[in-house]
Amino acid sequence: MMYMEKDLIDYKFSEDRLLDDLKAYIDSTYNAHYSKTKFQATEFIFDAGHGMGFCIGNVLKYAQRYGRKDGYNRKDLQKVLHYAIMALHVHDIEKKEST
């Protein structure tokens, strides 16, 4: 289990399970063919200062694609969440914020 305190929370929308699923999906992207080199292309985009636009663009892309390409594809929603997490990462670095 991801969170020790989750046993104390009565999740109404399966957030605990969905977060575990999302983490497994994100972990799988690090084993994908495009991450076999030392650096991912996304890192170069971030380093060039285009990280937020790249992430928000992909959030919009996969949100718009949901239900159109390959039907109502769960993976499209996972990609929306993954890019949103990366956007949060960029935000925290740029604004020097974190939890």
Which stretches of residues belong to each language-model region?
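Intrinsically disordered, low-complexity regulatory regions
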Residues: 1-99
